[in-house]
C-alpha cells in the first residue's frame, strides 16, 4: 500500500495527470461468490489507507471476472448478477459521490453468440501392425486409433482453446443420427494447438 500511495501522490503532483480512482482486478471466470466478498474487504482496506493520506478516489473500478457456464450453457444462460451485485451493495464501503465501475463484458455477452462452422474433412488414424498412418482405405487388421473432424474455423476465429485449453460446447447442427462417436475437432491451420 505504501508504494501505491507514493505513486498516487506523484501522479497528483504532475500537471498533465489527473488521478481519478483505483482499479482492482482479481481474475477471470470466477464462479465462487466468496471471492468477491474478499475483494470488497481488500478494497475497503485500501480505501481506508488512502483516506488516511488525504486521497479520496472519485472512481472505484472493481474489474470484472464474473464467470459464465461454458460446460452447460443452456442450463445457465445468464450469469448470477443478482448475487454478484448484492455482495458489493452489502460489503463495499464507498462514500457518497464515489462511483463504482464494473467490467462485465464476458458475463453480459459471452452466452449470446455461437461460432458456426462446417466440416471440411473427416480423417481417421489407423494402427496396422506397429505402424500408425492416415488412410482412406482400411485393411482387415487395421483398427481406428483416433478420428478427426477438420472444420473451416480455426484458432484465428476462437483462440481460447488454443491459448489455455478453454472448453466450449460443440453441437452438431445437421446430424439426426442417434449414434454418438468421439472425434477430435480441429481447425485447418497448420498448428498443433488448432483444436477445439
Language-model regions, residue ranges each:
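Active-site beta-loop-alpha junctions enriched in small/polar residues
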Residues: 24-31, 60-67, 71-73, 105-107, ...
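Charged (often Lys/Glu-rich) extended helix/loop segments that serve as interaction or gating elements
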Residues: 87, 96-196
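Active-site-proximal beta-alpha core segment in soluble small-molecule metabolic enzymes
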Residues: 1-59, 68, 73, 120-123, ...
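Alpha-helix-loop-beta-strand connector modules within alpha/beta enzyme cores
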Residues: 7, 43-45, 49, 82-95
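Active-site glycine- and acidic-residue-rich loops that bind
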Residues: 1-5, 29-41, 76-83, 106-112, ...
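Short, structurally constrained coil/turn elements
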Residues: 13-16, 94, 179
